[in-house]
Amino acid sequence: MANYFNTLNLRQQLAQLGKCRFMGRDEFADGASYLQGKKVVIVGCGAQGLNQGLNMRDSGLDISYALRKEAITEKRASWRKATENGFKVGTYEELIPQADLVVNLTPDKQHSDVVRTVQPLMKDGAALGYSHGFNIVEVGEQIRKDITVVMVAPKCPGTEVREEYKRGFGVPTLIAVHPENDPKGEGMAIAKAWAAATGGHRAGVLESSFVAEVKSDLMGEQTILCGMLQAGSLLCFDKLVEEGTDPAYAEKLIQFGWETITEALKQGGITLMMDRLSNPAKLRAYALSEQLKEIMAPLFQKHMDDIISGEFSSGMMADWANDDKKLLTWREETGKTAFETAPQYEGKIGEQEYFDKGVLMIAMVKAGVELAFETMVDSGIIEESAYYESLHELPLIANTIARKRLYEMNVVISDTAEYGNYLFSYACVPLLKPFMAELQPGDLGKAIPEGAVDNAQLRDVNEAIRSHAIEQVGKKLRGYMTDMKRIAVAG
């Protein structure tokens, strides 16, 4: 099979990369009705599989789970989760032939095997759904022409998809129809109904393409979302300890610092995150972020280039075929790093202390978010898509580090994201070592003392922060989510 993106001509590639439209609330007036009375069979019962299924059932849809025979006979975790939540469970052969919509929510590396197994069992005119388009775009999976292929991609982990639904809200979601597989022209109606059934329409839905979702998703997770957090954690910890900071305190400052810093990012973008600093610290964080952007820009561009060309995917799929040798080696090496093995700090660190003593970390977040966004947009991805795949998801990933350090992050994210994370962080750490050697007192681990600032310089820095394109689009999208939440709560 050939990489689907690489079979397109340049005009088609640009058109699919640039497909992004913010959908109006009125477009979801029918809710999930298009799928009511139809049989929806979910393959896979992991975090996305279970939680999307719970939401869809609560929205009035007929949901069941198709699992492999051995998962049922051996009563594996997927079988237990589905049955304990009262779902009908059966083998592929029992459930797939009756399905109107088969939703494939297994891990990326299992998609080809799953699709090749279910396709012959699917009835004529059925639909196949994904929540990530890797199998279609990068693997180039060929789907029978009578089958409609759609995607509904919540921009949050599965647990968050469920929690927001229970609160009467939802999570921002991308939807798409594969242009090669929409024989009856009903793909968009199916995708809209599925998105509404998960609650996504209450938080904002982008009409996208399989191509735009895959290329932007890979770029975000490799760079700012996972790779930058891993590289930053390792570099900052080593620097603090090298300068005499207690390893336990250094570990806590970093482990919980990312979450604290990015909570401000979530509420008010880079502007609010930077506003949490004193004026001298803000000027220093801005200067550091500009240096970091200059150093890291070629690395971000290389990752985007390799994603666009398919080089990244072919390398990762070669590792799949080699029993994940590289992935497992990198995972083991990460687990042995000084940051991961440092003792726990029993004392308390106040919220503002994370900002005051984490100026470099704030600079890393700002530089990484802006670089990821800029690199995606320069490659033809629309700003709204780039925002969701950079700034929006960062607090969610930072929260996983707060739970159990880098181990937890790498367990929670997909194997695809983990592989890309290691590629980036293994290149980024040595790249930034000379920069780390030149840091000044107050950049990390100590607060920058209050002092006089140049008003004109502060004015210009504030203007530069607030006028960045990610701040403009972010303000619009966060405002929409807030408005929608208000409506949902009132309703």
From Swiss-Prot:
GO terms for molecular function: ketol-acid reductoisomerase activity; magnesium ion binding. Mg(2+) 1 binds at D217, E221. Its cofactor is Mg(2+). Residues 209-344, 345-484 form the KARI C-terminal knotted domain. Transmembrane segments: none annotated. Involved in the biosynthesis of branched-chain amino acids (BCAA). Catalyzes an alkyl-migration followed by a ketol-acid reduction of (S)-2-acetolactate (S2AL) to yield (R)-2,3-dihydroxy-isovalerate. In the isomerase reaction, S2AL is rearranged via a Mg-dependent methyl migration to produce 3-hydroxy-3-methyl-2-ketobutyrate (HMKB). In the reductase reaction, this 2-ketoacid undergoes a metal-dependent reduction by NADPH to yield (R)-2,3-dihydroxy-isovalerate. Residues 15-208 form the KARI N-terminal Rossmann domain. The keyword Cell wall biogenesis/degradation does not apply. Keywords: Amino-acid biosynthesis, Branched-chain amino acid biosynthesis, Magnesium, Metal-binding, NADP, Oxidoreductase, Repeat. Substrate binds at S414. GO terms for biological process: isoleucine biosynthetic process; L-valine biosynthetic process. Binds 2 magnesium ions per subunit. It is an enzyme of class 1 (oxidoreductase). Belongs to the ketol-acid reductoisomerase family. This is Ketol-acid reductoisomerase (NADP(+)). The active site is at H132. Its EC number is 1.1.1.86. Pathway: Amino-acid biosynthesis; L-isoleucine biosynthesis; L-isoleucine from 2-oxobutanoate: step 2/4; Amino-acid biosynthesis; L-valine biosynthesis; L-valine from pyruvate: step 2/4. It catalyses: (2R)-2,3-dihydroxy-3-methylbutanoate + NADP(+) = (2S)-2-acetolactate + NADPH + H(+); (2R,3R)-2,3-dihydroxy-3-methylpentanoate + NADP(+) = (S)-2-ethyl-2-hydroxy-3-oxobutanoate + NADPH + H(+).
